Each structure stands twice: as C-alpha cells, then as structure tokens.
Swiss-Prot record:
Protein name, per record: Globin, minor monomeric component
Subunit structure: Monomer.
Any one GO molecular-function label of the UniProt entry: oxygen carrier activity
Family: Belongs to the globin family.
Amino acid sequence: GLSAAERQVVASCWKDIAGADXGAGVGKEXLIKFISAAPEMAAVF
C-alpha cells in the first residue's frame, strides 16, 4: 500500500492532470499511462 505522503503526492498529481484535461482527454490518457506504469497507484483512486 501507499503511505499517507505518497497518497498526497498522487492526489496532487491527479488534480494537476484533471485540471489540465479541460475535457480534451489529455488528462485521462496521462492518468492511464501513469497507472499503467505504476499499477499500485490505481488503488488510490
């Protein structure tokens, strides 16, 4: 599992990705790549 600090970092990254998305799908693609690269991160969402 992730530590509280790791969860905070991931949540912060997710907010950045979601904020940058603006409905264009870029954020979602980045998130999918991010989770693919680190499957354990998927548990955070």
